């Protein structure tokens, strides 16, 4: 039985110029059989949402190391809702205080995977979220 691979967009939003970690995650997800699109650095919320919709991804993963999560995620969710994609699974990665992680979960971020999360845990989390949604 053929199964369509899980499609994931990994995005770097804002001025953060560090992408080594997100590239490691991208490789791990690809090695696990997922289709991965990497946005590159310095993307806007609008670019990320547009790409997620155009590429028909199952999961949008936003990596942040710059402390802008409380600004970026409200914009992303507003744009997703406006474009009829409010059901997209959104996860966050990077570095952030526990209180920020809790705040973005309340906005709709399904999982917050910080810098010390092993790649296999990220893979398992994405598979579980997509399976629970019943995608593909």
UniProtKB/Swiss-Prot annotation:
It catalyses: 2-hydroxyisobutanoyl-CoA = (3S)-3-hydroxybutanoyl-CoA. Residues 5-133 form the B12-binding domain. Keywords: Cobalamin, Cobalt, Isomerase, Metal-binding. Adenosylcob(III)alamin binds at residue 18. Optimum pH is 6.6. SUPFAM superfamilies: Cobalamin (vitamin B12)-binding domain. Disruption phenotype: Insertion mutant cannot grow on 2-hydroxyisobutyric acid (2-HIBA). Its EC number is 5.4.99.64. It is an enzyme of class 5 (isomerase). PROSITE patterns: B12_BINDING. Its cofactor is adenosylcob(III)alamin. One of its GO terms (molecular function) is metal ion binding. CDD domains: MM_CoA_mut_B12_BD. Gene3D superfamilies: Cobalamin-binding domain. The keyword Transport does not apply. InterPro entries: Acid_CoA_mut_C, Cobalamin-bd, Cobalamin-bd_sf. Optimum temperature is 30 degrees Celsius. Homotetramer composed of two large substrate-binding subunits (HcmA) and two small cobalamin-binding subunits (HcmB). Together with HcmA, catalyzes the isomerization of 2-hydroxyisobutyryl-CoA and 3-hydroxybutyryl-CoA. Is specific for 2-hydroxyisobutyryl-CoA and (S)-3-hydroxybutyryl-CoA, and shows only very low activity with (R)-3-hydroxybutyryl-CoA, isobutyryl-CoA and butyryl-CoA. In vitro, can isomerize pivalyl-CoA and isovaleryl-CoA, with much lower efficiency. Plays a central role in the degradation of substrates bearing a tert-butyl moiety, such as the fuel oxygenate methyl tert-butyl ether (MTBE) and its metabolites. Belongs to the acyl-CoA mutase small subunit family. This is 2-hydroxyisobutanoyl-CoA mutase small subunit. It comes from Aquincola tertiaricarbonis. The gene is hcmB.
